[in-house]
């Protein structure tokens, strides 16, 4: 993008313009234990209207994790496709002021079998995480920490979940 930078005779510095990000990477680190590489999505941008520290963010990044969708399926479901891993994107969006952006998350199940069991389970999952912030946070945390989705009603740190996530 085009950026304008000015320094006046008093030493005041201003920036104006848009910086469009076509590609890039952001490494999410938690307690030096969890490191996940997020890919910055095309058309993300940073806009300056004067104050260099007052930039406005409109940035989207995604981390892809291949995981089983079986936690989303009914317990009675028996399909050979259950054990397969499917791409799930953990999406983070930063919007607003550079110093204190609004941060939002989403999970996007990219590909899955066309069977009615999978279609219904994924649709119900998407509806649940869109209408329940606590459920979205629980699922995002599970993907970040354990690289897997959780069945509905399961505690994030249930001992069986910890054991299977670490294995």
Predicted regions and their residues:
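Charged, low-complexity interaction regions
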Residues: 156-157
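Short, intrinsically disordered, charge-balanced linker/junction segments flanking boundaries
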Residues: 161-167
């Amino acid at each position: 993008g085009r950026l304008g930078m000015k320094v006046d005779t008093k030493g005041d510095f201003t920036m104006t313009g848009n910086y469009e990000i076509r590609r890039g990477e952001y490494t999410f680190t938690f307690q030096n234990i969890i490191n996940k590489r997020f890919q910055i999505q095309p058309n993300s941008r940073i806009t300056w209207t004067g104050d260099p520290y007052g930039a406005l963010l409109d940035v989207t990044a995604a981390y892809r994790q291949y995981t089983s969708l079986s936690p989303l399926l009914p317990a009675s479901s028996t399909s050979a496709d259950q054990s397969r891993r499917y791409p799930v994107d953990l999406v983070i969006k930063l919007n607003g002021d550079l110093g204190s952006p609004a941060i939002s998350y989403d999970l996007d199940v990219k590909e899955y079998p066309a069977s009615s069991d999978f279609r219904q389970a994924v649709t119900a999952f998407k509806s649940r995480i869109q209408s329940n912030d606590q459920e979205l946070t629980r699922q995002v945390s599970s993907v970040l920490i354990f690289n897997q989705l959780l069945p509905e009603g399961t505690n994030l740190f249930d001992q069986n979940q910890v054991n299977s996530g670490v294995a």
